[in-house]
C-alpha cells in the first residue's frame, strides 16, 4: 500500500483518510492534474479517466457505479455483479471521463456515465448526472448548461492557441 501512496503523491494525488479509492487501479489521471485532499473517488467496475490540467476545488466526489434497487427479496448489498447486467450490458457501472482543462469547483459530485467536455467549468456544488460538450459552463442539482464559455469563433481561436502551445513544449 505504501508504494501505491508514493506513486499517487508523485502524480499530484493526495490521498487522506477520507480519500475513497475503491478500484483505484481504474483511476487514470493525466499530467498537470492534481486531486486534492478530501476527495472521494469510487471506481467500481468502470474506470474514471481524468485528463490533463484538470483543476478541482475542495472535496470533489466521483462515482462510476450505482446500486441496483429493483430486485425483490434481496438487500442492495446482496446484488451480485452479474445482476447488474441488463441485456448483456452493465448499466450500473459506467465510466466517468473528465477531459483536458476542466475546472470543477468545490463540492462537485460527478456520477456514472458522465463525460465533461474539455475546457468546461463545473460550478461549485453541482451534481453532474449527464454529459456535456466541450466549453460548457454547468451548474445546479442536477447540473444544467448555464452557457458556453466562448463563441464559436473564440473556441476556434482557443483550440488553435492550445495546439500551438502544446507543440512549443
What are these regions (language model features)?
Residues 17-29, 35-112, 141, 149-150:
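Flexible, glycine/small-residue-enriched loop-and-beta-strand segment within the central core
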Residues 3, 99-102, 122, 166:
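Hydrophobic transmembrane signal anchors and adjacent membrane-proximal interface regions, especially
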Residues 155-169:
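Acidic/histidine-enriched, glycine/proline-rich intrinsically disordered or flexible terminal extensions
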Residues 8, 31, 109-146, 150-158:
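C-terminal/domain-terminus segments
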Residues 1-24, 169:
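Extended, small-residue-rich solenoid/repeat segments and analogous flexible loops
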Amino acid at each position: 500500500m505504501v508504494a501505491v501512496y508514493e506513486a499517487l503523491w508523485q502524480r499530484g494525488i493526495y490521498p487522506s483518510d477520507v480519500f475513497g479509492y475503491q478500484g483505484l487501479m481504474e483511476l487514470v489521471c493525466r499530467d498537470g492534474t492534481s486531486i486534492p485532499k478530501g476527495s472521494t473517488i469510487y471506481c467500481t467496475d468502470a474506470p474514471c479517466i481524468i485528463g490533463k490540467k484538470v483543476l478541482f476545488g475542495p472535496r470533489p466526489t466521483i462515482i462510476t457505479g450505482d446500486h441496483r434497487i429493483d430486485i425483490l427479496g434481496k438487500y442492495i448489498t446482496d446484488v451480485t455483479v452479474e445482476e447488474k447486467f441488463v441485456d448483456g450490458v452493465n448499466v450500473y457501472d459506467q465510466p466517468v471521463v473528465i477531459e483536458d482543462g476542466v475546472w470543477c469547483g468545490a463540492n462537485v459530485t460527478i456520477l456514472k456515465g458522465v463525460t465533461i467536455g474539455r475546457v468546461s467549468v463545473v460550478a461549485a456544488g453541482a451534481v453532474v448526472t449527464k454529459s456535456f460538450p466541450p466549453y460548457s459552463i454547468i451548474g445546479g442539482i442536477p447540473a444544467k448548461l448555464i452557457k458556453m464559455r466562448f463563441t464559436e469563433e473564440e473556441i476556434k481561436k482557443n483550440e488553435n492557441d492550445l495546439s500551438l502551445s502544446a507543440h512549443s513544449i
